[in-house]
Amino acid sequence: MIKIYDTMTRSLQDFIPLNEGKVNMYVCGPTVYNYIHIGNARSVVAFDTIRRYFEYCGYQVNYISNFTDVDDKIIKGAAEAGMDTKSFSDKFISAFMEDVAALGVKPATKNPRVIDYMDEIIDFVKVLVDKEFAYEANGDVYFRVSKSHHYAKLANKTLEDLEIGASGRVDGEGEIKENPLDFALWKSAKSGEVSWESPWGKGRPGWHIECSVMATEIFGDTIDIHGGGADLEFPHHTNEIAQSEAKTGKTFANYWMHNGFVNVDNEKMSKSLGNFITVHDMLKSVDGQVIRFFLATQQYRKPVNFTEKAVHDAEVNLKYLKNTFNLPIQENANDEELEQFVKAFQGAMDDDFNTANGITVIFEMAKWINSGHYTSRVKETFAELLEIFGIVFQEEVLDADIESLIEQRQEARANRDFATADRIRDELAKQGIKLLDTKDGVRWTRD
C-alpha cells in the first residue's frame, strides 16, 4: 500500500482514495509573470513523478495544476513591458509549457486559469460574507480569521502564536482590518489595474481564493491530494483550508503534500535572492532529462543542493542508464531475479515516493543487466521503471558503416589479426562508439 507523508498530521498515512481506483490531485501551479527557475521546476517534476507512480499502480489520475494569471506581479510586469495583462501572462504560460515539456512532464488533465473563474470566485466570496466568515471594508473583502477555530493547523501553529507575530505589523490594510491576520478575498480596483464588477464594487480576487474556487469547481468539496512547494504551507494553503472549509463545512483535502526546495549554498533558490537559473536558460546547455534526473536524486520532501557537479553527475549517471538500455538482448539469459528488483523498487516508491531509494534500485538493476541478464522481459520492465521518472530512451540504431566496422573487427579478432582489430576499435572510439568484448560477444555503448 502507498504511504504518504501528510503535512496536516505530520505523519505517514495509508493512501485511501475517495473513489476506489481513482486519484484527484490539485497542485498549485505558477504565477505567470516570468520564466520558471529550477526551484519552481522541483514541484512540477516531483508531482509529475508521483502522478506517474499512481498510474503505474493502476490508478486513474485526474491531475489539475492551475495558472495564476491575476496577480500584483503580473500587473506590474505587464505595465513595465507595455502589454495588457492577458497577453503578458499568455507569453509566460506558453514558455512554461515548453519548459516542462522539455523536462518530460506529462500534460495536466486541466490547467485552469483564474480569469476563467471570476463569476465563481465572486459567488464563493458572497457565501463567505453571508455566513459572516468574511466582511467588506472600503471595497475590499477580508476573511475573518477569528471565526476559523482551527486556523493554521496545517502549519502546526495556533492563532495565538500568529497574533503575537503579527502584532507589530502596521500597514494601510491593518487600519481597516478587524484582525492583522485577516486576509484579502477581494481587492478593490486601483487606477489602471485590470478589474471586474462585483457586489463590493470593481476589483479583483486575492491570491488564496483563486485556488480554492478552481479546486472545488473541478473536484467538488473534498479532494484526495493537494500539493505544492513547502513555502505554500503558510499562508497560502493555510488560507485555502480556512476559506474552503468555512464555505462547505467539509474537509478540503484528505492529504497535503509539500516538496522541498532547491538550494544554492544552503539557501533557497528564489527570484527575490537572485540566486536562480531559469529552466529556459539551463536547457540551452543541459538536456531536459538530465535536469529532471538531477531533481529526482532526493526524496521529494528533502532539499536538493544545486551545483554544477551535481548536474554533471546526473548527466554521467543518465548516460550509463542509457547505455544499459541499449545493450543487445540475450534471450537465453537468466532473468529470474527480475521480480526482486521490481519488488524493491515498489517498496521504495510506496514509502512516500522515495525516488532516491528508487533510483538506487534502478542502478542495482542496471549493474545486474550489465552482468549478462538482459532479456526482452527485463528491457521492458527497465523501461517501465525509468518512465516513472519521466526518462524515456529511444532505441539506438548504428549506422551501417559502423556496424560493418564492428563486423570487420570481429573477423580480425577471429583471425588473430589484433593490430587491425585495435585500429578499428580506436577508429570507432573517435566516433564515440566504445566496444566491450565479453564471453557473450561484443557490446557497444555510445560514449
Swiss-Prot record:
UniProt-annotated binding residues for ATP: 271
Gene: cysS
Location of the protein in the cell: Cytoplasm
UniProt keywords, alphabetically: Aminoacyl-tRNA synthetase, ATP-binding, Cytoplasm, Ligase, Metal-binding, Nucleotide-binding, Protein biosynthesis, Zinc
Motif ('KMSKS' region): 268-272
Name the UniProt record assigns to this protein: Cysteine--tRNA ligase
Organism per entry: Streptococcus agalactiae serotype Ia (strain ATCC 27591 / A909 / CDC SS700)
Reactions accelerated catalytically: tRNA(Cys) + L-cysteine + ATP = L-cysteinyl-tRNA(Cys) + AMP + diphosphate
Database matches in Pfam families: CysS_C (PF23493), DALR_2 (PF09190), tRNA-synt_1e (PF01406)
